[in-house]
Amino acid sequence: MKVAVYPGSFDPITNGHLDIIERGSKVFDKLIIGVLVNVDKKGLFEIEERVELIKKVTKHIKNVEVISFNGLLIDFLKAYNAKIILKGLRAVSDFEYEFKMALMNNKLDPDIETVFMMTSAQYSYLSSSSVKQVAKFGGCIEGLVPKEIISDVVRRSKI
């Protein structure tokens, strides 16, 4: 069974993330969405809220599981018998950072492979940070995040 982990802070989950999840779920037998605390970013949603938002927008995908974690990604993979890290790439600038992370993860555990998946072109500009910025200033986030969570993002952005 090919088990992959798609890690990220997903704060909030965007249509770009969902695109990778939907496509990744067709490639792997099981896809675990690893929701992490990113100490370098100020969060819009608490980790438990992010898990629930992701579950809400992925409930139609049967082989996806959403789990929060804190710590090393390699340890998370081992805990769930996963050998593959799935990473979405928007641009060459993403690749440079993700390539270094893939090398580090492989150094920590040579049995772990990182698979890169290009984001669909219509989402190549999209990031959680840009969604937060647009929502904070009252802009329309329709088409940027799954419709099921638009009201959650708008409501939280006004706080």
UniProtKB/Swiss-Prot annotation:
Substrate binds at S9, K41, L73, K87. GO terms for molecular function: ATP binding; pantetheine-phosphate adenylyltransferase activity. InterPro entries: Cyt_trans-like (IPR004821), PPAT (IPR001980), Rossmann-like_a/b/a_fold (IPR014729). It is found in: Cytoplasm. CDD domains: PPAT. GO terms for cellular component: cytoplasm. Its cofactor is Mg(2+). Homohexamer. NCBIfam families: coaD_prev_kdtB, cyt_tran_rel. Belongs to the bacterial CoaD family. This is Phosphopantetheine adenylyltransferase.
